[in-house]
Amino acid sequence: MNDNSIEHIQECYIEDYNQWAYMIDKSLKECLGETDTSVISQLIQINKSNADGPLAGVPYAVKDLFDVCGFPSRNSSVLPEFNACATKNSAIIERMSQLGATCVAKTQMNEFAYGLTGENPHFGNCRHPLLKNCLSGGSSSGSAYLVAADYLPLSFGTDTGGSIRLPAAWCGVYGIR
């Protein structure tokens, strides 16, 4: 029987995340950034009020530049001024929530989105999901990684000088600027 209920989809996502978190290959943890299953469960509970939306139950991630209320937007930096938790959501988070989707992760990136490789001296380099000796591209590296590895159906990044297009091309997924 194929159960496509919101609850089933979300349970499968949490089950999959638990498997990813313990992978020997640490590149996924480096790409995910600030997320754990209790956070995912909390975000799912918050979003159940929009269970009728066209994207109900769809998990997605955002680059660590986007504000998610209650979570720090670190810009993949360790500077203390970036440790404060956001007091409101970015517009894309609000809109996706209205549509019923659930933000389940903030992804790794080049520090301050300044780079095209996926390298980060503080949180580790975001490796290519299939070619372990290669990088995923940047600066929206974690977003491309999660979609290319088929962990999430979509993820949001930012693009000024190729920061979506390069990692999408390097990882073999579609990236829309």
Region roles according to the model:
Residues 1-85, 113-115:
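Short, well-ordered alpha-helical
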